[in-house]
């Protein structure tokens, strides 16, 4: 059970005769949260030579819940809503490598649809973020016991961020580029 889940609330509010759209955090009422998680990781150390460094990782999370959200800033009335920022289904699958001073990880992470904002004005509909899958790559090489080199590529598939008001009315689409990074690490 959940009591007082903190969530942002947006409402058009009149201040000094002028209407402003105000967003601020507030405690919600009671809610419920239930779910299950499954994960497994296995290295294929039964394979010969450098192949023994390969492995795989998988995890899956299922969450269901609801929450009582206030119907207005100063209201004592509540309505049952989804939990803000909580996707019902999420999973991660990765191919791993560790051996001969090399580490690598190619991973796909999927986050399901989730509600980002309850009853967004002026349409009074929930803002829903659409499911997205990100694919990332990380490769490291140990030059010697004290120095290692790391390469990262985030969002290889250039997955986009998409939100809508209610289930169908597009609100926001952002095209996210692939981000690359290189680092050199020293151990003292």
Per-region residue spans from a language model:
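Short coil/loop residues immediately preceding or within conserved phosphate-binding loops
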Residues: 23, 134, 179
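Short solvent-exposed loop/turn micro-motifs enriched in small/polar/acidic residues
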Residues: 88, 130-132
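Short, contiguous acidic/charged loop-to-helix segments that flank catalytic cores in large enzymes
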Residues: 28-29, 79-83, 123-129, 170-171
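C-terminal beta-signal and adjacent terminal beta-strands/loops
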Residues: 1-3, 54, 110-119, 140-188
């Amino acid at each position: 059970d959940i009591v007082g889940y903190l969530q942002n609330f947006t409402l058009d509010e009149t201040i000094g005769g002028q209407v402003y759209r105000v967003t601020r955090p507030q405690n919600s009422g009671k809610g419920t949260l239930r779910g299950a998680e499954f994960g497994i990781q296995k290295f294929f150390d039964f394979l010969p030579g450098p192949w023994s460094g390969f492995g795989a990782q998988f995890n899956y999370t299922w969450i269901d819940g609801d929450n009582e959200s206030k119907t207005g800033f100063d209201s004592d009335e509540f309505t049952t809503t989804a939990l803000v920022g909580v996707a019902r289904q999420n999973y991660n699958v990765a191919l791993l490598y560790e051996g001969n001073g090399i580490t690598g990880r190619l991973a796909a992470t999927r986050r399901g649809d989730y509600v980002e904002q309850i009853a967004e004005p002026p349409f009074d509909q929930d803002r829903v973020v659409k499911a997205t899958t990100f694919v990332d790559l990380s490769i490291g090489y140990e030059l010697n016991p004290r120095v290692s080199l790391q390469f990262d590529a985030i969002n290889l598939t250039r997955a986009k961020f998409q939100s809508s008001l209610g289930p169908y009315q597009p609100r926001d689409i952002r095209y996210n580029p692939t981000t690359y990074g290189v680092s050199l690490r020293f151990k003292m």
